[in-house]
Amino acid sequence: MSDGEGEQFFNLEGEDILRLESRLKNPRNDGQIGKNPRQRKEDQAPQEEPKKTTRRPDKNKGLSQLEQLILKYVEEESCQDALKDFGGLIANIRQAHQAELTSHLEKVATEHRANLQALTKSQQEHEKVSKEILSAVIAIRSNLNENHSPRPKPLDPDQVKAARALGFGIGYRTALNVFDRIKGVTPDNAGSQEVKNMAIRAAEEDEYEGSPTFFRKVIDAVKKRMKQGQ
C-alpha cells in the first residue's frame, strides 16, 4: 500500500469515526460490523416476486373414470391395452348381468300371469256362488212373504173359471146319473138352470162326485122340480 493510498484510507470524517467507534464498542451478535445505512436501505428494498409459472393442464381431463383409474396404477405405455382388456371384461359382466336380469324378469312375469289367471278364476267362481246364494235368499224371502202375508193373495181369474168349469162338469154328470135312476125325468129337466146352479154351488163347496151330501141335494132338487111340473 502506498502512502497516498494510506492517506485516502484513513481520511475519515468525524461522524464516520464516531460511528465506527460505537460499532466497535457494541459489536453485533453475529460478529459482523453493521453496514452503511444506505446499503441497509438497498438491502431492505422489496425483491421482485418470482413469476408464477402457468400450471400445466391435467392430462387426465376428459378421460373416463375407468381410464383415470387405469392411469393411476398402470404405466401410460400399457394404458390402451389395459383399457381394452378392462372394457371387454366389463362388457362381459354387463352382458351376463343383463341376461340374468332378463331371465329373472321373465320368470316373475310368468308367475304373475299364473297368479292373475288363478285369481280371475277364483273371482268368477266366487261371483257364481254369490249369484246362487242371492237367488236362494230371494226365493226364501218370496216364500216367506207369500206364507206370512197379512192380506190373502187374490185368485187368478183364469184359475177361478177353470175351477168353476170343472165343478160344473162333475156336478152335471152326477145329476144326469141320478136322473137316469128316476122315472119320468127328461133331459130337459136334467138340464134346467136350477140343477146347473146347484151343481156349481156344490163344486165350489168341494162336494164332488160320490159325496152323499151332493147326491141328496141333487135328488131333492129333482123331486122339487118334478112336483112343480105336476
Curated annotation (Swiss-Prot):
Keywords: Host cytoplasm, Phosphoprotein, Viral RNA replication. Pfam families: Rhabdo_M1. Phosphorylated. The keyword Phosphoprotein applies. The keyword Cell cycle does not apply. It is found in: Host cytoplasm. One of its GO terms (cellular component) is host cell cytoplasm. Residues 39-61 have a biased composition (Basic and acidic residues). Residues 21-62 are annotated as: Disordered. Belongs to the novirhabdovirus protein P family. Essential component of the RNA polymerase transcription and replication complex. Binds the viral ribonucleocapsid and positions the L polymerase on the template. This is Phosphoprotein. It comes from Infectious hematopoietic necrosis virus (strain Oregon69) (IHNV).
